[in-house]
Amino acid sequence: MSELYNLIASCNPNRQSLILTALDGTAAGEKAFFADGSLQWESGKKGFFSHFAENLPDISAPGIITENSTRIFCEFPAHEQKLVICGAGHVSIPVIQIGRMIGCTVTVLEDRPKFADNARRAGADTVLCQPFEEGLKKIPGDRDTYFIIVTRGHRYDQVCLEKIMKKEHAYIGMMGSRARTVKVKQALLEQGADPQILESVHTPIGLPIGGETPEEIGVSIIAEVIQEKNRCRKRGGFTKEILRAILDEKDKDIKKVLATIVTKKGSSPREAGTKMLVYQDGRTVGTIGGGCLEADIIQ
């Protein structure tokens, strides 16, 4: 089974990956991993999932489907969410801190050494202290990359937005007044930029909560990132922490259970696919929402 978890940990976020688990019937417990509709791995030797390669159901969110009287749980790998912040001014600091708090990997681009140092102290995973155009050449982008443009002037905004629009992305947000953002967009349109991508750029950036201080504005920006992430892509619970724990050679002989929500009722905040790894000694990685249910599972 470690082969499956290694596949999940290393899968390309720009490919359509899918994990299937048979919940009942003769194939109960069998798993399979698909990428772009092609079967990459299957746990059983009976080939229960082989026919799915020819007729893979259209699945947009984690949940249960029924195939030939067998219930099958479908989920997607939870790719690492990446924040790329252009600019390390006052607003960027809480964005970095809250971004790390929600589990994102944070990269900051800043051409001023003093401000780059501030980003490092705030906890950014990577800080590129160089011109924005040069720094963005090192950022490949993918469907799990969220670009936040908070530079000190519209000419820098324009440079960043022009380069970012050509990359794969999950989100682009740009701070600035309406007049400033309109000016930047108009200039890029005149240079032949894709109007559809320009229209998708979140300006003004952040949810409209009336934020005034850098901290309040930072909250609104991350809130919008979270909203976009959860609106567009319902992901499963194979977080990097859980995958790291499962694949950790030091604990390979310790028994553990991977608890997964396969369906939910009511207003529980945790979606299908959410996972918690429970060790025999009571340690846990992740959470399925806390409360009495989680306590019972740990017991």
Protein language model regions, located:
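Segments forming oxygen-rich coordination pockets for charged ligands
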Residues: 1-111, 118-125, 187-189, 228-299
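Short, acidic/turn-prone active-site loops that include or flank metal/cofactor-
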Residues: 45, 111-114, 131-135, 153, ...
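Short glycine/serine/threonine-rich phosphate/pyrophosphate-binding segments
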Residues: 92-95, 155-160, 180-183, 270
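ADP-ribose/adenylate-binding Rossmann-like module
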Residues: 107-109, 146-153, 162-187
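Short, glycine/polar-rich helix-capping loops at beta-to-alpha or helix-loop-helix junctions
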Residues: 113-119, 156-159
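Conserved SAM-binding strand-loop segment of SAM-dependent methyltransferases
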Residues: 125-131
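Short amphipathic alpha-helix with an adjacent loop that forms part of the alpha/beta core around
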Residues: 133-143
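Adenosine-phosphate binding glycine-rich loop
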Residues: 175-243
